[in-house]
Amino acid sequence: MAEAAESVVVSFEEFKKLRLIIGRVLEVKDHPSADRLYVLRVDVGGGKEKQLVAGLKGRVPAEQIQGKLIVVADNLKPAVLRGERSEGMLLAATDGDKVTILTPQTEVSPGSVVS
């Protein structure tokens, strides 16, 4: 996982451009051509699904991601990572070698906006 860019300061107006929503992980697959990546299929509400590529393999078991509610950066420009399209990014915290996926404290519907 990338380290936070501590020296970068963004305005509140810039921050508001990022859309954070809740998604539910429907499927976790090993990336076909990368040892440290998973390919996730995520329900983002409104009958829509997105594919995310996440650098969690080897740090978080797939079984701990499957079915989980996650926080998704929903409006990032899509990227292709090692041949797989990623249409957003899940949020996680890193403390040394420990990675924790950010999740809501209670059950909320996919597509719910994080504010």
Q: What are these regions, as identified by a protein language model?
A:
Residues M1-S115:
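Phosphate-backbone binding interfaces of nucleic-acid-interacting proteins
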